[in-house]
């Protein structure tokens, strides 16, 4: 297993059931890590497992949800305890029965890693560089990986029946495959020019009430956004988002002024009297990238790719860790079908599985007129329709739940085009939904 972050850990837990030995190789000191690691620069920022991600994580690692709950990891109902706002209008609060896991990336990763560490057939190779894949050209097979201690020393070959690349967006597998004669890996990308700036605070007010996060989401009309999440007790983390090259300020005064410019007052009201904890951290995400391994004419046996090494998503949609769990489940299903592992079959199955999340992320980014990309008539229609749906969902808990189940990757995107949903959108847009009447011009308030 190349890489021991979330994607590598979920996949390692799966592989440990079917293989006699699983070795996780990572450039960082990962065992016992309680703070964001150098190899995971996005780890400073607010993270979460979407509703479907929580369900899949529990399926992959039984008991994980209760373990995190016992440790105080923030969790809440997708529609009842997460405060979502679009264009200054809060989605109607609605209990969905679906759990979202939030908070600190290092803490979430640590809980999954502790379960992998306790498996009797797993081993961590820390502070180790991955030099190259080992390839048997005669048989068209990856047979292992060459590694080297980060501090220097001799290279070593780790032989393996299966090598899984979970090294993230900087994966070198496309370069290695091309050098081995398998051709160039094509990719799809959408440039969004996103920047996160994150700070942590100690709150002096009850900003959350019974909620666990406050999420005014960026839109073309209001391109500044934020994710304010409880970290337990009186601590919170807040990630401000800027797109198309805008960078939220890192200085405290500028940071607070940015929150005041958001279309809802909740985040600013929570932070204006809060105590800052440490300095701000910024992270740039230029583009979503989907690597199309399934389109290669030839693939070596003994190789799989998971996580951001396979597909990176605009992080404002919160899909990354959920997709890591999904791909681990695809890997499990491919290994457990009773036949020899087929990379082609795996990559095709993984591509099909991530398609809904990719369509949501790319479609959302293409709603911004400045983002370059092909806008089919369907994409234009869907983005206009979703704008009206979110507007109507301010007054309609059923619409809010339908929308959240889709962005939570529980239901397929087509569910929002069902006749019953479309009728409620029309009523909410042109005639009022009849639910929470009179709230159409209100804005979200803290508490």
What are the roles of these predicted feature ranges?
Residues 16-45, 346:
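Glycine-rich FAD pyrophosphate-binding loop
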Residues 3-9, 27:
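Glycine-rich Rossmann-fold phosphate-binding loop(s) that bind the pyrophosphate
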Residues 14, 34-83:
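N-terminal FAD cofactor-binding segment of flavoenzymes
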Residues 86-105, 109, 142-144, 241-243:
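Helix-loop-beta segment of a Rossmann-like dinucleotide-binding subdomain
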Residues 118-264:
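Predominantly flavin-linked oxidoreductase catalytic cores and closely associated redox partners
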Residues 48-49, 95-114, 172, 249-250:
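Short beta-strand to alpha-helix junction loop
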């Amino acid at each position: 297993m190349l890489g021991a972050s979330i994607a590598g850990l979920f996949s390692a837990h799966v592989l440990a059931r079917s293989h006699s030995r699983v070795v996780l190789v990572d450039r960082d000191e990962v065992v016992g890590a309680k703070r964001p690691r150098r190899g995971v620069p996005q780890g400073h920022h607010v993270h979460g497992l979407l509703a479907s991600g929580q369900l899949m994580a529990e399926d992959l690692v039984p008991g994980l949800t209760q373990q995190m709950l016992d440790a105080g990891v923030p969790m809440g109902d997708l529609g009842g305890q997460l405060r979502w706002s679009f264009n200054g209008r809060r989605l109607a609060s609605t209990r969905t029965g679906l759990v979202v896991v939030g908070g600190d990336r290092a803490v979430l990763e640590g809980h999954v890693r502790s379960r992998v560490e306790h498996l009797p057939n797993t081993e961590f190779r820390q502070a180790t560089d991955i030099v190259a894949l080992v390839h048997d050209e005669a048989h068209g097979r990856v047979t292992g990986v060459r590694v080297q201690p980060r501090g220097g020393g001799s290279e070593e070959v780790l032989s393996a029946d299966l090598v899984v690349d979970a090294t993230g967006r900087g994966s070198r597998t496309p370069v290695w495959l091309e050098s081995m004669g398998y051709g160039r890996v094509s990719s799809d990308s959408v440039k969004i020019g996103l920047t996160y700036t994150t700070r942590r605070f100690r709150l002096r007010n009850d900003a959350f009430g019974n909620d666990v996060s406050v999420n005014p989401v960026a839109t073309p009309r209001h391109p500044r956004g934020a994710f304010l999440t409880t970290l337990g007790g009186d601590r919170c983390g807040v990630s401000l988002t800027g797109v198309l090259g805008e960078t939220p300020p890192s200085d405290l005064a500028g940071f607070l002024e940015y929150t005041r410019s958001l279309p809802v007052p909740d985040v600013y009201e929570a932070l204006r009297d809060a105590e800052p904890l440490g300095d701000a951290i910024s992270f740039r995400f230029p583009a979503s990238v989907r690597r199309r391994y399934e389109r290669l004419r030839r693939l070596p046996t003994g190789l799989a790719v998971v996580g951001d090494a396979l597909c990176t998503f605009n992080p404002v949609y919160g899909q990354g860790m959920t997709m890591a769990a999904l791909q681990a489940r695809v890997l499990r299903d491919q290994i457990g079908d009773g036949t020899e592992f087929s990379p082609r079959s795996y990559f095709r199955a993984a591509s099909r599985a991530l398609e809904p999340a990719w369509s949501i992320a790319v479609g959302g980014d293409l709603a911004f007129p400045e983002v370059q990309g092909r806008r089919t008539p369907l994409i234009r229609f869907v983005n206009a329709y979703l704008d009206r749906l979110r507007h109507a969902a301010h007054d309609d808990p059923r619409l809010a739940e339908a929308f959240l189940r889709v962005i939570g990757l529980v239901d397929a995107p087509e569910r929002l085009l069902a006749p019953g949903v479309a009728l409620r959108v029309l009523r909410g847009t042109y005639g009022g939904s009849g639910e929470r009447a009179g709230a159409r011009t209100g804005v979200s308030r803290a508490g």
